[in-house]
Amino acid sequence: MSEYTLQQLADHVGGEVRGNSQLPILRVATLQSATGDAIAFLANSRYKSQLETTSAGAVIVSEKDDSDAIDNAIRVVNPYAAFARIAQLLDTTPKPAHGIAESAKIAPSATIGQNVSIGEYTVIDEGVIIGDNTSIGPHCYIGPETQIGAGCTLWSGVKIYHRCVIGDDCLFHSGSIIGADGFGWAPDNGKWLKIPQLGRVVIKDNVEIGASTTVDRGALDDTVISSGCIIDNQCQIAHNVFIDEDTAIAGCTVLAGSCRIGKRCMIGGASAINGHISVCDDVQIMGFAMVIKEITEPGVYASGIPASGHREWRRNGARFRQLDDLFKRVKELEKQADDNN
């Protein structure tokens, strides 16, 4: 377990220490659960009262939220971002085992970089290129001619199909599948003809893919996820989707084929984006939204129906079916009023 002084942590995040600068810190914790060897954070002023009761050794706070109720603090402009950087320093996630397991199968034509780890029963197929300092967990499969950059981590059970391209410093969680066929079929006299999916998946640097998320390969062109994107668990990214830099997508979201998502977008959980439409930069889509047409202006968008009491929902559902008739009646009343005037 790593140990840092409060001053070292403050220097790391560009903050100012108030209190004992040599206080040793071993871990991060919440305000409620922290003990004297931990540092907590306050990112929302609504919870400032918790400073009165916390047992944390120190707290990361903004200058306006600092309080005499805590003896030691690091003052920063953005407490949440500072917490994230300190949490990275004090991360206790187990590191993958070093070296290449005896049970791993590596094709003779594969190129393996320096300091690469490959877990038990993993298969590295022909023509694969793996960059330096990359770790591939047990029971993974890397398909022919796929390229994986330096400093990547693939947890157990990741599958990457043929000819995909993965950048540097990517993190793929267990069960994620990259490069499976997109859903491409042509109707033919009541039957379906499969369209070979001949494109690739190209994932740029510093991308995180959540557990059991699937990213389909392109039909002819590539499916592309740009640098800095973060995608949560159990998402479906269909063929020929393009996601621009630093976009975040929460769990169970579906991006249909050939949609384009701009930079710095945030898409809430269980949302659905229609195929062949574009979403511009800096758009926030609330959870459970259904986006069926292009979004051309930055802002916040929502379309989900909030939960309500069952009886209320049934009444509103019945009224919803009457909307078209009510609209026609209102238009007729407006016409009659205009005629009378």
From Swiss-Prot:
Keywords: Acyltransferase, Lipid A biosynthesis, Lipid biosynthesis, Lipid metabolism, Repeat, Transferase. PROSITE patterns: HEXAPEP_TRANSFERASES (PS00101). Pfam families: Hexapep (PF00132), LpxD (PF04613). Its EC number is 2.3.1.191. The active site is at 239 (proton acceptor). It comes from the Bacteria. The keyword Transferase applies. GO terms for molecular function: N-acyltransferase activity. It catalyses: a UDP-3-O-[(3R)-3-hydroxyacyl]-alpha-D-glucosamine + a (3R)-hydroxyacyl-[ACP] = a UDP-2-N,3-O-bis[(3R)-3-hydroxyacyl]-alpha-D-glucosamine + holo-[ACP] + H(+). GO terms for biological process: lipid A biosynthetic process. Gene3D superfamilies: 1.20.5.170, Hexapeptide repeat proteins, MurE/MurF, N-terminal domain. SUPFAM superfamilies: Trimeric LpxA-like enzymes. GO terms for cellular component: membrane. Pathway: Bacterial outer membrane biogenesis; LPS lipid A biosynthesis. Catalyzes the N-acylation of UDP-3-O-acylglucosamine using 3-hydroxyacyl-ACP as the acyl donor. Is involved in the biosynthesis of lipid A, a phosphorylated glycolipid that anchors the lipopolysaccharide to the outer membrane of the cell. Belongs to the transferase hexapeptide repeat family. LpxD subfamily. Homotrimer. This is UDP-3-O-acylglucosamine N-acyltransferase. It comes from Idiomarina loihiensis (strain ATCC BAA-735 / DSM 15497 / L2-TR).
